[in-house]
Structures are given as structure tokens and as C-alpha cells.
């Protein structure tokens, strides 16, 4: 029912400011999840089990971080058939993010530009929301740094968030690739990344001993990397035994949307224009990593065939964001069925 109604809902939502529509959708999904209405209206999604990072996934199609930054609608999203859910990015302290307007649709290109800036209610409220959810499937918790934390102290924020979310996460994503927090992408540099991952792995080992379980770490990287940078990141992942990598975040490139309304807005571009760049990074990572580190592919998936292409490039799992906004819940089932066909 959601799938058949979504085109009508989208027509109304797309007449609204993009961020207002986003918040309205979150409130509706949150309410639907709490009342059980989402389950009653959701499309049938077949099981297509996968085991990745030592975790059992109902199917390989997940929700990407960013749609539910505070973990307020986990049950609503889960009812739509996703094989796993990732929420965040969360920071140690609540922060408002960048000034509005900060989210722009480019429907001619099936794209979105956002410069949200890790707006969130802080890790304490985030953990409360996660604990309140009834969902018991694979749940990724995505962590970042506060905007006013100097980049030299970024590790402190990641370590603090890791400690807070660890008991409640199936896996934890280290987001160092958002273009909307000043200097954040510097952490992708070889020296900076080596130091950060060393600290996080040490913390992970101590938390595993404390809680009696090893929660995998995944690193989320940008599409705007040259071959040498991808090689350096891959080598660092292997050196520190990082359990997963998510490729990719949004792009700063505007090559594919030149001349379109809002194309010159600052921020990260997501959607169809990032599809090829994301796949290229996935292929390069797979060549460097072999089968040692699984890849979660995200960026520009608008069809089942797009999801299959991500897996063909080397991903073990995929995530949806902008395609889900444009296509709605039907895209989840379409991707799962296409992947299950092989």
C-alpha cells in the first residue's frame, strides 16, 4: 500500500521545502512505527540472507545514514523491508548544523544537494531513541565529530561516541567523509587516518572485553578520491583490521548537474550523478582489499539493476538514500528481488 500511495505523497512532499518535507516524513514514519501501521501497509520484501562482517542480514539492501539522524524512526524504516538500518550521523553534543536553507532537490538529475552539517540532538538522546526502538535486525550507528571540535581533537569525539553507542550497535560507522563539516575530510589523509583508526581499534578491543562482544567498525569514505588516495585508505584499513568500508558519501563535483537550478549551492551532491563515481571507488577498493574487507556500496541506486551493478563492482551490501526519496518503498523490494535473481 505504501508503494502504491508513494507517488501521490511524493507529489505533495516535493511542493514543500526539501527539509520540511524530510522532517514531516520522519514524523510520519516514526508514528507509523510506534503504532504498527507501517507493518500493515508495507510491501512484501523477500528474504535474501547474507552474512557480512560476521552479522546476519535478512537481505543486502539497507537504509543509508542521514535520513534518520537521531534514530527517531527506526521501526518505521524497518517495516519497509530494509535488510539493515543505519542511523546518524551523531556527535557527542547536540548541534544545529548549518543555517537553512541547506537541502535542495535537483529533480531533473534525480539528485539532492545538502549542507546539513551533522545537525543532531547529541549522542545521549540518540542512545535513548535507539533503546526505545523495537527493531532487532542489524542496526548501524554512524558517528562523527562536533563542528566546534578542532580537527586535531577529532579522535576525542569519535572515541566518546564509540563508547556511548557500542552496547546498542550491530556495527559502528566512522564518518570522516561529509563535505559539510569544515576540514573533516582531512581525516582521510594517510597520517590522520592511521592515527584515528589506531585509537578506535584500541578502544574497540577494550569495549569488546567490557561488553563481551566485538562490534565491527566500518569507515565511510568520499567519492572524490584519486587512485593513490584509495590505495592508501585500503592499506590503512588492512593494517588496522577494520571490519568494513562504506563507499561512498556525497560528492563535491557538479560536472553532471551544470546549469541546473540549485547546482551551484554548496554542499554534497547525492543521487544518480554520483553512481559512476561511487562504483569506480568500489572497484578500486575491491582490487586493493580482495575479500579481506567487505564493502557497502551506496550512491545513485534508483533501480534493481543499479543495486546489482554495485555488487558487480565489488560491494557485499548496498544502501539507499536519494533513490529512496525519489522512488519510495517500492525501490527496496525491487533491489532485493533483482539481487536475489543473481
UniProtKB/Swiss-Prot annotation:
**Top-level taxon of the source organism:** Bacteria
Q: Name one GO cellular component term.
A: plasma membrane
InterPro entries cross-referenced by the UniProt entry: Aldolase_TIM, DHO_dehydrogenase, Dihydroorotate_DH_1_2, Dihydroorotate_DH_2, Dihydroorotate_DH_cat, Dihydroorotate_DH_CS
Q: Where in the cell is it found?
A: Cell membrane
Residue positions annotated to bind substrate are: 69, 114-118, 175, 180, 249-250
Q: Name one GO biological process term.
A: 'de novo' UMP biosynthetic process
Q: What class of enzyme is it?
A: oxidoreductase
Q: Where does FMN bind?
A: 65-69, 89, 142, 175, 220, 248, 271, 300, 321-322
Pfam families, per database record: DHO_dh
Active site at which residues? 178
Keywords of the record, alphabetical order, are: Cell membrane, Flavoprotein, FMN, Membrane, Oxidoreductase, Pyrimidine biosynthesis
Q: How does it sit in the membrane?
A: Peripheral membrane protein
GO terms of molecular function: dihydroorotate dehydrogenase (quinone) activity
- Major location, coarse class? membrane
Catalysed reaction, written as an equation: (S)-dihydroorotate + a quinone = orotate + a quinol
- List, alphabetically, the PANTHER family matched: DIHYDROOROTATE DEHYDROGENASE (QUINONE), MITOCHONDRIAL (PTHR48109:SF4), DIHYDROOROTATE DEHYDROGENASE (QUINONE), MITOCHONDRIAL-RELATED (PTHR48109)
* Record NCBIfam families: PRK05286.1-1, PRK05286.1-2, PRK05286.1-4, PRK05286.2-5, pyrD_sub2
Briefly state the protein's biological role.
Answer: Catalyzes the conversion of dihydroorotate to orotate with quinone as electron acceptor.
Provide the family line: Belongs to the dihydroorotate dehydrogenase family. Type 2 subfamily.
Kindly state the subunit structure of this protein. Answer: Monomer.
Q: Which HAMAP family match?
A: DHO_dh_type2
Q: What is this protein called?
A: Dihydroorotate dehydrogenase (quinone)
- The species this protein belongs to is Burkholderia pseudomallei (strain K96243)
Amino acid at each position: 500500500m505504501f508503494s502504491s500511495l508513494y507517488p501521490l505523497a511524493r507529489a505533495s512532499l516535493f511542493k514543500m521545502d526539501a527539509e520540511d518535507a524530510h522532517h514531516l516524513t520522519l514524523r510520519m514514519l516514526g508514528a507509523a512505527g510506534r503504532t504498527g501501521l507501517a507493518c500493515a501497509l508495507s510491501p512484501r520484501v523477500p528474504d535474501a540472507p547474507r552474512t557480512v562482517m560476521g552479522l546476519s542480514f535478512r537481505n543486502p539492501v539497507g537504509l543509508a545514514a542521514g535520513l534518520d539522524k537521531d534514530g527517531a524512526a527506526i521501526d518505521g524504516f524497518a517495516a519497509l523491508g530494509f535488510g539493515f538500518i543505519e542511523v546518524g550521523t551523531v556527535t557527542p553534543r547536540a548541534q544545529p548544523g548549518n543555517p537553512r536553507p541547506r537541502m535542495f532537490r535537483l529533480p531533473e538529475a534525480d539528485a539532492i544537494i545538502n549542507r546539513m552539517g551533522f545537525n543532531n540532538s547529541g549522542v545521549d538522546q540518540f542512545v535513548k531513541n535507539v533503546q526505545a526502538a523495537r527493531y532487532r535486525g542489524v542496526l548501524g550507528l554512524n558517528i562523527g565529530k562536533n563542528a566546534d571540535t578542532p580537527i586535531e581533537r577529532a579522535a576525542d569525539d569519535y572515541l566518546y561516541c564509540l563508547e556511548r553507542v557500542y552496547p546498542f550497535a550491530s556495527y559502528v560507522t566512522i564518518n570522516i567523509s561529509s563535505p559539510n563539516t569544515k576540514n573533516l575530510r582531512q581525516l582521510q589523509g594517510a597520517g590522520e587516518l592511521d592515527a584515528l583508526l589506531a585509537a578506535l581499534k584500541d578502544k574497540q578491543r577494550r569495549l569488546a572485553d567490557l561488553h563481551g562482544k566485538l562490534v565491527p567498525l566500518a569507515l565511510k569514505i568520499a567519492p572524490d578520491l584519486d587512485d593513490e588516495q584509495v590505495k592508501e585508505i585500503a592499506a590503512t584499513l588492512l593494517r588496522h583490521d577494520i571490519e568494513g568500508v562504506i563507499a561512498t558519501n556525497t560528492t563535491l563535483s557538479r560536472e553532471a548537474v551544470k546549469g541546473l537550478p540549485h547546482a551551484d549551492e554548496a554542499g554534497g551532491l547525492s543521487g544518480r550523478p554520483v553512481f559512476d563515481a561511487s562504483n569506480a571507488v568500489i572497484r578500486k577498493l575491491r582490487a586493493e582489499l580482495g575479500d579481506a574487507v567487505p564493502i557497502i556500496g551506496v550512491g545513485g541506486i534508483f533501480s534493481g539493476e543499479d543495486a546489482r551493478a554495485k555488487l558487480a563492482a565489488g560491494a557485499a551490501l548496498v544502501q539507499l538514500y536519494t533513490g529512496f526519496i525519489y522512488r519510495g518503498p517500492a525501490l527496496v523490494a525491487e533491489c532485493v528481488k533483482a539481487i536475489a535473481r543473481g
